[in-house]
Amino acid sequence: MDKSRIALGLLSFAVLGAILGYVLASAFLTFRWFGVGADIDFLMLARGYIDLRITRPADMRIVHLIVGICTSAGVLLSAVLMNDALTKFGETHWQTLSEMKRNGFLGEAGHGFILGKMGKPKGGKPLIMSKVFPHALIVAPTGRGKTTGFVIPNLLTYRGSAVVLDVKGENFEATSRHRAAQGDKVFRCAPTDWKDGRSHRYNPLLRIAGLENIDRQQMELQLLATLFLQADSDRVQGLLDGGIDLFVAAGLLAFERKRPTLGEIYRITASGGDKQKEYRRRADEVQNPAAKLIFMRMASTNNDTLTSYLSLLMTSGLKQWSNPAIDRATVTSDFDFAEIRKTPLSVYLVVEPLMVKPMAPLIRLFFSDLLATLQDHEPGDDEPWPVMIMLDEFNRLGKMPIVTDSIETLRSYRANLAIVTQTIPALDEIYGENARRALQGNAGIKLYLTPSDEKTIEELSKAVGKTTKRVVTRSRSVGRNPFAGRSMSERTEETALLPEDEVRRMDLDDIVLVVDAQMPVRAKRIKYYEDRFFKEIFDKQSGELPYPSTKDQMRGLQGQIQALEQKIGAMQVSSGKKEKPARRSEMDALTAEGAGAEPQRVPTIEAYQDASARVDRFLEGAAVE
């Protein structure tokens, strides 16, 4: 029991005892002086207390004794009652409005995540915001309204840059015009927009290719590969490591060719029939000593092992770049994550629901590069904007170690991370229970929308906490006298504040917030299309959606055409003439030692002419639109 409540109880019983003592003392004096039948004057003692102490000291000693005994009896009674109290177990309770205000959950929208509302959407109750905790884990099964109740409301209000995985593209359609009107530069990356092909481009290798230190380039390529290339089983991790070595060597060769793209890495690793001969030629071509050594090692590896390396490299994520659309979407970058804290950017990575799993390597690469860029340095004075990152369908993206590792430190880099998953078991399957618990703990706030699977129901009930329930048992013995033998017993028992049965029956509009080091919160989810605050923001949007312009698409396609024409022209020149590639100062000394390299092996002229014709047709279609 709270110490302040104990003190208040003791004081209350002491005052009651003193009042009773005063009444008895007044009656004693009246009956002693005026007889038993006299009317009691309760003010007599108060009026003449000082004089009576002088004139009637013996009587006043009795008065003091009566008042003292009654006061002591009151204190003793309070102690007895408190000792007689039933055992208390947990004391968890739902946060009150005053507690939430004190804990920083009520305030102006735009700073931190908006989590829910204290009342129905159409009502005037306050919104619940997370200012103290920068990250959130949202557990929401399909159809629970995580998009309308969490993602869209935050995109409509967040003041800063935003990067969101937009499954189905509805977030772009609902919020991009508002964010553009607020001054954000809006980008829509949609590699699988088969219908219109309207997509901005993003190339994660440009950041690495721009590094001056070639040793750091190698390390960054290896880190990048481990972030997005994943095997289905840990038993083949050794083979995947060999594939990653091949990826790194191909990346360094692509940098030397001045074509730093994942598509080029795919072509380097996959081209050629006899892989041993092919990689021997690549070893002769590349000037980087580390890449040369890797290619030579691959050339001396037996064919079965080499095939396993390459096969696992492709199935782990690189094969997606065999698709021309994916290759085009990553050939260059229309935006730079290094600028995301300097000027507000809104980047929507749009993927159709059925494409989330096949596109998981690109999605992992996209967000891993974002997190790595943010953590390159702490924000300076010229980087005032925070960054909101929303990872929807997190359980379908495969393992992202950089998320579990960086969520502990992202706060100091001015980033707010929201992870959305459907169930707890889905996370356990990928990360394991211990890593999942660490992820939950570092999130600070866990937002649950009516769970459906048993593991999540059990997890939520336990996470909310325990409370104490008073149980009264009545019994009677059967006999002739129905009023005889009756008894009543009272006890307390520990129970969940939110029992599992109640979790199963939660209203679909209810949400539960589990907060680190605080009492839980029960509230209502937001419906932006019904809430007056959000509906007003949404309805103010006007104009066309900020899709990539035809001019932007034509500029990118023209660049590809020029590159194709240059390759075709180069193939028509005598193969004996070879231009020395430009190299950094670190490589100049190594160039002389690498003499005797054979001409670069490239695809046929017909293949490039066919590709150029396809690009021309696409360009003509874009120009007509």
Task: Name every feature range the model reports, one short phrase each.
Residues E493-A496, Y529, K535-F538:
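Extended alpha-helical interface modules used as scaffolds for assembling large macromolecular complexes
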Residues L20-S26, T30, L127, V132-A415, ...:
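P-loop NTPase motor domains
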Residues I407-T409, Y413-V512:
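Conserved ATP-driven motor cores of ASCE-family P-loop NTPases powering translocation/secretion/packaging/pilus
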Residues K117-G123, T330-V331, E429-I430:
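Short gly/ser/thr-rich secondary-structure transition/capping motifs
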Residues H178-A181, N203-L206, E433-R436, K462-T467, ...:
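Short secondary-structure boundary/capping segments
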Residues M118-G119, R525-Y529:
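Short beta-strand-to-coil "C-cap" segments at the C-terminal boundary of structured domains/repeats
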Residues P353, E393, T421, T450-D453, ...:
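Short loop or secondary-structure boundary microenvironments that flank
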Residues M1-R144, T148-V151, P204, K466, ...:
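Basic- and hydrophobic-enriched, low-structure N-terminal and domain-boundary segments
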